């Protein structure tokens, strides 16, 4: 009997959601520092190691700031800066990309109406992508299924040059974004783009299901041709 190739995946080390530490909270101003360290060892064709056995160490660090806005009730000014430390692309960079910006945005957050932010954001497409993103090294590549990138400023889940509204109403999550790009991408193909998503949670006892839908539309710069 001919045996097909089987894969063995072994995870070791520490992997978690971001741990946060509040280092300042006074007079309506807050400052949180957070981060994550992730270590992985894998072997097999269905893992990031391919046909070999490899390890990967990565992580992230960020700061989140808020300030009460007195002129608008229940509203805060918010800002986030987050960096990727070394890499999350399953290799071991030790050069200039040791620290890459993941998020950098400022905006307003209202208790009732949600937040309006601008900068490099976690875009609306991630409402769908986050369902399996935590397993991206060991599941089919969700980034390939109808999700398009045409230049460095219009890509999968971290979006440059974006004005975005995020809101939650009675279990409904809505995100809308207008994308102008950052003007410093490798091929500057983007003229403008728009994204939207909707996510709803249903709970049946201890069981919960959360369907989501997202859409993305964009316009290329006139005269720019790419293969994406």
Label each residue range with its predicted role.
Residues 22-37, 49-181, 190:
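Outer membrane beta-barrel
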Residues 7-8, 18:
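Cleavable N-terminal signal peptides
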Residues 37-44:
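Short polar catalytic/cofactor-binding loops
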Residues 14-22:
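Sec/Tat signal peptide C-region and signal peptidase I cleavage site
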């Amino acid at each position: 009997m001919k045996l097909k190739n089987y894969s063995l995946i072994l995870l070791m080390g520490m992997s978690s959601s971001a741990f946060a530490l509040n280092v300042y909270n006074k007079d309506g101003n807050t400052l949180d520092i957070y981060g994550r360290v992730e270590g992985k060892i894998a072997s097999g064709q269905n893992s990031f190691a391919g046909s070999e056995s490899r390890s990967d160490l990565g992580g992230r660090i960020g700061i989140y700031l808020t300030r009460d806005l007195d002129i608008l009730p229940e509203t805060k000014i918010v800002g986030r800066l987050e960096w990727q430390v070394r890499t999350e692309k399953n290799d071991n960079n030790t050069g200039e990309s040791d620290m890459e910006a993941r998020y950098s945005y400022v905006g307003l957050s209202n208790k009732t109406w949600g937040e309006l932010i601008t900068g490099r954001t976690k875009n609306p497409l991630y409402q769908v992508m986050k369902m399996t993103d935590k397993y991206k090294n060991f599941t089919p590549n969700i980034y390939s299924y109808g999700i398009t990138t045409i230049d460095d400023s219009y890509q999968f889940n971290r979006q440059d040059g974006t004005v975005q509204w995020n809101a939650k109403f009675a279990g409904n999550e809505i995100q809308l974004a207008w994308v102008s790009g950052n003007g410093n991408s490798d091929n500057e193909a983007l003229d403008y783009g728009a994204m939207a998503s909707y996510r709803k949670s249903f709970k049946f006892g201890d069981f919960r299901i959360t369907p989501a839908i997202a859409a993305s539309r964009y316009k290329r710069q006139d005269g720019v041709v790419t293969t994406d």
